[in-house]
Amino acid sequence: MARNKLVSGSHGIWKYFNPAFYLRRPRRLALLIILFVSVSMVVWDRQSLSRDYQFEVSKLNEEVLRLQQMLEEIKSVTEDVSVNSLKDVQEDPVDAQRMQRVKEAMVHAWSSYEKYAWGQDELQPQTKDGVDSFGGLGATMIDALDTLYIMGLDEQFQKAREWVASSLDFDKDYAASMFETTIRVVGGLLSAYDLSGDKIFLEKAMDIADRLLPAWDTQSGIPYNIINLKHGNAHNPTWAGGDSILADSGTEQLEFIALSQRTGDPKYQQKVEKVISVLNKNFPADGLLPIYINPDTANPSQSTITFGAMGDSFYEYLLKVWVFGNKTSAVKHYRDMWEKSMNGLLSLVKKSTPLSFTYICEKSGNSLIDKMDELACFAPGMLALGASGYSDPAEGKKFLTLAEELAWTCYNFYQSTPTKLAGENYFFNSGSDMSVGTSWNILRPETVESLFYLWRLTGNKTYQEWGWNIFEAFEKNSRIESGYVGLKDVNTGVKDNKMQSFFLAETLKYLYLLFSPTTVIPLDEWVFNTEAHPLKIKSRNDQVNLKQSNKVLLRKPAFRIRQRHYGRITKK
């Protein structure tokens, strides 16, 4: 009974799978068709959605790959962005126009040198010939290399590079200045190497540096200041009474430390750091050293103390080696010496009457001399660069204020003459403010150097305006058809016959950078030597080749820039 019921039930189920069941009943057939179509549509829709989903996923994957490729391309381009391509990145149209004007001035100076003095040390524009002021070391050629590179003058840079590779020869029977050869030639070659990565510049820098090394072979380690490049005989100038000069002996540290870093050979760094160690043993309480030092005993003579000629860059390098050394404990003694010297500097600072120009005196014995060289106008830039390193913010602010006041004085060295170009030095007499002493102008860079630093570190556009006024004065008074010349007298405008190599290395470079984006040679990545040759900051003991790290990347400014504003410092 139960079995028959199960069979009957099973037969009842299977009848729905029999087509005759539906053919005999049209309504059932219609329902079946509708059901079939509905199921088919559902299945098809699900398959369609699946295909659409897969298609969209595929498209998204392709887009991800495309974006990854774009990112890689951007990274590749960014890594290859040198200062050459940064010339197109501007902060405002006025800066762009002024950069172009300065660049055109560089092209004029360089093409004149190329036409009339190629391969010689310096151009004499009036007579349209060259002169070997530095023994035929190609001073202008080497001094201008990094300026050409920074301005994106690729063709000129490559032609100069070929000359360096094929014609630059240091095997000369010539008594070279240690100081000038280091800051111009060693510094210029190292900067060209750091910027371009071209090893020919490093090889040449090693060649000339090796020829200078015997100058440090003295009883104290204080170097002689003159050396024969061929024979290695070193001595001091007779007019110095056998003494070494402070600036000439203490302005090789940046270049030779950099050379040791880039070659892995410590001998260069050891020579120059011994000088600082020796001087630091008996460093005076006020941090101020006379300009003459005995190379045998390292004792200073009773001579002038100055931040002008023969003293200036010693103090500059105490600060810059600290910056170049990443401000680590290994170079802390440089900073300590510099801060001590800056406290001593305060004892040399006076104000004129009636206009209260702040100036730096020279010191002879216990007497202050109311005289300031234009060379000392590097000091505002140095003070601005060092101000942020004080542990006490109030101290930093004090020295930044001093920097701004001194810059105003230096700018007025220019504005106080009929040509609007500064004389070589100035005297400050009570009741008459400043008066020009030695009245020539040889295209010096120190004031525009300080304006560059102050612009970068404060954002005050007034410093750009001052720099532009100085540039226009050079254009009006010093530019001639065959280059640029100095003035024999800034009062009359009578021209001389020399285009100094530092005009291309320093004056035009700092003017160009004064109007360039702050990402071009950022101050937290590069240190300028005293000839304005930028050297790349790296780990002090890291001997890795810099070629891959020499790219100047698009990035935020080196320092936190204050809001840009106008207005010179007001005088109380």
UniProtKB/Swiss-Prot annotation:
Anything known on activity regulation?
A: Inhibited by kifunensine and 1-deoxymannojirimycin, but not by swainsonine.
Named in its record, the pathway it takes part in is: Protein modification; protein glycosylation
Effect of a null allele? No visible phenotype; due the redundancy with MNS1. Lack of complex N-glycans, shorter roots and increased lateral root formation in mns1 and mns2 double mutants.
Where is this protein localized, as stated in its record?
Golgi apparatus membrane
State the tissue distribution.
Expressed in flowers, siliques, stems, leaves, roots, pollen grains and shoot apical meristems.
Q: Which residues form a coiled coil?
A: 51-81
Task: Tell me the protein's name.
Answer: Mannosyl-oligosaccharide 1,2-alpha-mannosidase MNS2
